[in-house]
């Protein structure tokens, strides 16, 4: 299969290149850029020399339609809204890693992303690609909205409750931490070493654009689920997300019963690992992999459940899940090209 990537010079795009180099069905990778065409790709990422030696190609739909079988879009917001309709018209399936197509209501998107939404028809034709939960829809999809990094960790952590109608949304707090690579490669004051090192800070309080994405999916699984309290924090690490969720425990269920619910729910999901009683995951334990590790417990004193979910934001939170969706779309084993062991320590 010939695969194209728009936005290969970003961290998510570079991770796609790394993964696809090990994918048995990736015959060729063509990397596109509207600003750096002709530039040697390895000049941007020297660690990929002798692995991805190609030059960046110009973005022209006339040539693209004859070059590739599927396109990943790993570009900033706005690019997919422009290119997805063109690629769809050319009959090329698209997996979009941006947030352009995740929010079904254009007005909600514009409120949270502070930019014009993609065409409504394009948004409505996109399948939300949370791989473990949307397999049937993904199998026949031609346009996939790859979930955001925070929503992936949070939704996988809450799905067993919400899909069984057990989520108690009267009290639901999501406290999430991320590594700095989630902010992208472009330099900024907030990601400057002197600002980040030996520091830990909250950001986008009550304004994080992943909030409506989480709420939208929870309401789809358990109608009537209300707003959540979501806080994002920037940790002094390169990769990783830890989402800790606090909610009222399902009525009449012990910690062991809730844990069994989770284990049964994900028993056929290779990439979701439910930790045993008393064992809680750390971001380092999924580093560089497509795994999501989850622990769940119930405090019988407060009758509240605590769910901890960890992922690598560039893998399960972006490129890894995108390739997992590619595998599902094509009827391949989900793990194809994704069986890399977490890098530890």
Swiss-Prot record:
Pathway: Amino-acid biosynthesis; L-arginine biosynthesis; N(2)-acetyl-L-ornithine from L-glutamate: step 3/4
Biological role: Catalyzes the NADPH-dependent reduction of N-acetyl-5-glutamyl phosphate to yield N-acetyl-L-glutamate 5-semialdehyde.
PROSITE patterns cross-referenced by the UniProt entry: ARGC
Protein name (database record): N-acetyl-gamma-glutamyl-phosphate reductase
Entry GO CC: cytoplasm
Source superkingdom: Bacteria
Class of the enzyme per the UniProt entry, highest EC level: oxidoreductase
Key words of the record: Amino-acid biosynthesis, Arginine biosynthesis, Cytoplasm, NADP, Oxidoreductase
CDD domains named among the record's database cross-references: AGPR_1_C, AGPR_1_N
Gene3D superfamilies on file: Dihydrodipicolinate Reductase, domain 2, NAD(P)-binding Rossmann-like Domain
Enzyme Commission (EC) number: 1.2.1.38
GO biological process, one term: L-arginine biosynthetic process
Active-site residues from the entry: 149
Annotated organism of origin: Bacillus velezensis (strain DSM 23117 / BGSC 10A6 / LMG 26770 / FZB42)
Pfam family of the protein (one): Semialdhyde_dhC_1
Gene that encodes the chain: argC
Coiled coil: none
Compartment annotation: Cytoplasm
Catalytic activity: N-acetyl-L-glutamate 5-semialdehyde + phosphate + NADP(+) = N-acetyl-L-glutamyl 5-phosphate + NADPH + H(+)
Gene Ontology terms, MF aspect: N-acetyl-gamma-glutamyl-phosphate reductase activity; NAD binding; NADP+ binding
UniProt KW Oxidoreductase keyword: yes
UniProt record similarity statement: Belongs to the NAGSA dehydrogenase family. Type 1 subfamily.
């Amino acid at each position: 299969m010939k695969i194209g990537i728009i936005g290969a010079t970003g961290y998510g795009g570079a991770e796609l290149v790394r993964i696809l180099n090990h994918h048995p069905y990736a015959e060729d990778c063509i990397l596109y850029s509207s600003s750096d065409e002709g530039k040697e790709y390895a000049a941007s990422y020297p660690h990929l020399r002798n692995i991805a030696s190609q030059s960046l190609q110009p973005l022209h739909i006339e040539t693209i339609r004859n070059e590739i079988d599927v396109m990943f879009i790993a570009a900033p917001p706005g690019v997919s809204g422009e290119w997805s309709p063109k690629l769809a018209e050319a009959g090329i399936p698209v997996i979009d890693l941006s947030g352009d197509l995740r929010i079904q209501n254009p007005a909600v998107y514009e409120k949270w992303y502070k930019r014009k939404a993609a065409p409504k028809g394009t948004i409505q034709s996109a399948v939300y690609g949370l791989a473990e939960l949307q397999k049937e829809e993904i199998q026949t999809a031609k346009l996939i909205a790859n979930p955001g990094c925070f929503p992936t960790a949070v939704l996988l952590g809450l799905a067993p409750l919400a899909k069984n109608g057990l989520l108690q949304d009267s009290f639901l707090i999501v406290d999430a931490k991320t590594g700095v690579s989630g902010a992208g490669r472009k330099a900024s004051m907030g990601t400057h070493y002197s600002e980040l090192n030996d520091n830990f800070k909250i950001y986008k309080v009550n304004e994080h654009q992943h909030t409506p994405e989480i709420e939208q999916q929870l309401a789809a699984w358990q109608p009537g689920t209300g707003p959540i309290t979501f806080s994002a924090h920037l940790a002094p690490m390169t990769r990783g997300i830890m989402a800790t969720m606090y909610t009222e425990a399902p009525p009449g269920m012990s910690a062991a019963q809730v844990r069994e619910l989770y284990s049964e729910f994900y028993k056929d999901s290779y990439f979701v690992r439910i930790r045993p009683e008393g064992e809680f995951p750390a971001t380092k334990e999924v580093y560089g992999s497509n795994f999501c590790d989850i622990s769940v417990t119930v405090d019988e004193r407060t009758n509240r459940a605590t769910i901890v979910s960890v992922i690598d934001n560039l893998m399960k939170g972006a490129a890894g899940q995108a390739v997992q969706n590619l595998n599902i779309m094509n009827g391949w084993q989900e793990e194809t090209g994704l069986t890399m062991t977490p890098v530890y320590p």
